[in-house]
């Protein structure tokens, strides 16, 4: 089965892990500091805090910004953690509709702020599939209204916006190191920023809110958590980061093949990456035309049966029963239609062009047999 995304683990990773496992200290040691340093250098920021998941990273980012009882404006087209973490931090969430590239619509965000900008604790955006949001425009809005900006760049480590790495322009940016993401530490995440005070706060909360005083003595100055990432995981992350650019090139090769082969086909559209952006290609979404919406489940099952691992990104967060109970029925037209249309097909560094051709041929072969027709 060709999965939609896949980790890259080679002998160099195994060697790095083996060496780390033989060290005296397995957690809370120098590898944590080293991983944070190389991550800062790669992204081009001053400070980083690595954690045991991107969800933990989001939770502490929201908490550090002091958003309790305030509103977080965010996208519905994301893994639920983007909104969940805000709720856990004591905020309310409000969803802003998306554009046809899956990213939050900065014009609709601006309209919401023009309507009422009071009690907004943060704007939290997601670089869908590894393709940057319009971060300059959104950052300008955040500064205009004096609202903190979080860039949930979980998909986008290594992506570029106007020749700069994604993760530099928000007050706090989040990366994920889950196995399907650009690099992996098994599970893991990070917050990066040029704001030392915010990162110091997050580092304090990462480890129970405890500070060392002298010898055996310490003090707990805040109610914190155990969100630490082990030295063993960090050793893997350090080695993974060395391979990232090469792996992104391989992903881009597969995506470029798809872009060319899928041009002007009668079944679906693809997301066009603007020339001032470079996506990490975490996902390769196809967007079925409306006459195929009702056949999506049939197509999904047929592709799996044929050995093409597909996934859907994402069910809008407000469609989960928990959020329906919390917020009531919400309908955002673009997010709803994107969910009806979207399928993520295999695109990762473990593939070659022969694999990509197999995906293309299989996809078209199945679509040719699908009986199109509008729902209802």
Positions of predicted regions on the chain:
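Hydrophobic/aromatic ligand-binding patch that stacks against planar heteroaromatic rings
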Residues: 84-86, 141, 182, 232
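Active-site phosphate-binding strand-loop segment of PLP-dependent enzymes
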Residues: 101-185, 190-192, 196-197
